Amino acid sequence: MADSSGRVGKSGGSGTGKGAVSAEQVIAGFNRLRQEQRGLASKAAELEMELNEHSLVIDTLKEVDETRKCYRMVGGVLVERTVKEVLPALEGNKEQIQKIIETLSQQLQAKGKELNEFREKHNIRLMGEDEKPAAKENSEGAGAKSSSAGVLVS
């Protein structure tokens, strides 16, 4: 017996209801992976901009006298220092940012690989994707493809 959501109850074939939940779980998992990948890419882009800012400031400070006063934001407080004191700290920060960017890049590649494996495992196609390769696969192995239904994600 079907309820208002269109799922089949216990008296009917419960396999169809389980399949719908499974497809929803696959889509949710895929969207979660995509969101994680976007978050990594966003953080990497943000750090790239920060790295460029550090490079500009370092290049500018290298051209001025080491005893010249400069101001640095430390924990929300503007602190007066000399170029001689600030320059090594900025260079250290720049190196740390570069290491973090490299780590994020590796994580981004791993997440992309994980996402592609998930897509292949669950036969996920994105809307607007070229369907010619899928048609070619269907003509070669029609028997194998009919048993696993693909998931279309918008």
From Swiss-Prot:
InterPro entries: PFD2, PFD_beta-like, Prefoldin. It is found in: Nucleus; Cytoplasm; Mitochondrion. Residues 1-20, 126-154 are annotated as: Disordered. Keywords: Chaperone, Cytoplasm, Mitochondrion, Nucleus. Its main location: nucleus. It comes from the Eukaryota. Belongs to the prefoldin subunit beta family. Binds specifically to cytosolic chaperonin (c-CPN) and transfers target proteins to it. Binds to nascent polypeptide chain and promotes folding in an environment in which there are many competing pathways for nonnative proteins. This is Prefoldin subunit 2. It comes from Rattus norvegicus. The lineage of its organism: Eukaryota, Metazoa, Chordata, Craniata, Vertebrata.
